[in-house]
Amino acid sequence: MGTIDISYYNLFVGLLLLAIPFFYLWKFKTGLLKPAVIGTLRMIIQLFFIGIYLKYLFLWNNPWINFLWVIVMIFVAGQTALVRTGLKRRILLIPITVGFLCSVILVGLYFIGIVLQLDNIFSAQYFIPIFGILMGNMLSSNVIALNTYYSGLKREQQLYRYLLGNGATRQEAQAPFIKQAIIKSFSPLIANIAVMGLVALPGTMIGQILGGSSPNVSIKYQMMIMVITFTASMLSLMITISLASRRSFDAYGKLLEVSKEAKK
């Protein structure tokens, strides 16, 4: 039995559930009602367009087009990270783009080529969803970690300079701030991994079961999805911080103005 389709009418009926959270956003004057409505409308429009695009992407199944789509995702993720972190373009754009590109290619192709052992590693059926999952998780973890890293450096400038003054290298002086960034970014992911299957069934597993896969196959895919997202997120963060830090300090190790707001 395949996945049951949802008619457009039934989809509309399902969307009516949003009236509940929208009501409480309005009742308590949170200021989030307008962003929530706009965000929902954007989600609907974007997903419909992506659905149309992916239909032809899967139909063509062209390696060059598939890879171009990944490049587009990386570009959009880089721009999104710039907005969410508030860091200057010259500080973050190249480092996070390189971090995303290297991580998604290394980890994604390792999974598709070595673990799944597909004859065509650029098959749209696997290439696009796997790389999309990796990009989404890398973006979230990088934004949280970079915000924590740079806010910590700004807040604890005296500690950073104290470490440098006592003979620490730049890498050693930056290590406590990188540590805090990793803890803040990856603690939720690690907690989620620990209770997976007990507290909640993950989306990938549910999707595969609804699509007709056996639970045994689904759990193995879910295990690997968690492994590759964890690995790719950590690798991309380390690459991004390493490259961004080289642009964030002067010759004497002093933190430069890295935020866009600093220009005001």
Spell out what each predicted region is.
Residues 148-181:
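Short cytoplasmic-facing helical segments at TM-TM junctions of multi-pass membrane proteins
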Residues 6, 10-13, 65, 91-145:
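Loop-to-helix entry region at the N-terminal start of transmembrane alpha-helices
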Residues 191-216, 220, 236:
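Non-cytoplasmic
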Residues 21-34, 77-88:
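C-terminal ends of transmembrane helices
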Residues 216-245:
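Hydrophobic alpha-helical transmembrane segments of polytopic membrane proteins
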Residues 173-199:
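Transmembrane alpha-helices
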Residues 31-53, 58-70:
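Loop-to-helix transition at the N-terminal end of transmembrane alpha-helices
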Residues 4-17, 60-75:
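Structural signature of hydrophobic alpha-helical transmembrane segments
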